[in-house]
Regions:
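A cross-kingdom feature that marks ATP-driven nucleic-acid transaction machinery
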Residues: 48-59, 63-185
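Conserved helicase/translocase motor-coupling segment
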Residues: 1-55, 61
């Protein structure tokens, strides 16, 4: 209610639809224009809504990692909910049993891990050092932790069993992050 008041939302139905669409896109690259088109408001309105949700710790935008910090400011982030319970409610998930078989299970687990890493960092009085990585070949790692002198890559999976394919993107990113001496481009 406070967020809606801050935004002076005139049509609560559209704002609720926006929240549900965001919950359905957890862990995906955020595209304001796409959401705006789906609910019939301007991209500027969506950006304003996201800004307030971010400032009030309802959502967290995970930026992409680029060595060039200017690119980090212009490329699209991924959106996560700071409260996975809220995300589940927006998705209509009412029990652990339902979650166990829901198509969003993996995304919600990724959301939980990202937000817990973020909270740990913020509770230490530090700014976020979390990113995600995706290259032009669609190699993607869910989380990169920038430790100043090194990067730690984390791939989040909710699967009950290990599959060697889970390592593919991690190995590719590790080649880029930790190249042999003299091979970094």
């Amino acid at each position: 209610r406070d967020v809606r008041d801050l935004l002076n939302v005139k049509d609560i139905r559209l704002f609720n639809m926006f929240l549900k669409l965001c919950a359905g896109r957890i862990g995906s690259v955020f595209n304001a224009s796409e959401i705006a088109g789906e609910i019939g408001v301007s991209s500027k309105t969506i950006q304003a809504w996201v800004s307030i949700l971010q400032a009030s710790y309802v959502v967290y935008l995970l930026p992409p990692y680029f060595e060039n910090s200017r690119k980090r400011l212009t490329k699209s982030p991924k959106m996560y909910f700071c409260d996975t319970g809220l995300a589940c409610t927006l998705l209509g998930i009412e029990s652990a049993e339902q979650l166990a078989f829901d198509k969003m299970r993996g995304h919600l687990f990724e959301n939980l891990i990202v937000v817990e890493l973020l909270k740990r960092r913020l509770n230490e009085g530090k700014e976020s050092n979390l990113y995600f990585y995706r290259d032009s070949n669609q190699n993607e790692v869910d989380i990169l932790v920038n430790n100043g002198s090194s990067l730690d890559a984390i791939e989040v999976k909710s699967a009950m069993t290990y599959n060697p394919s889970f390592e593919k993107a991690l190995l590719k990113v590790n080649e880029w992050v930790n190249p042999p001496v003299g091979k970094r481009t």
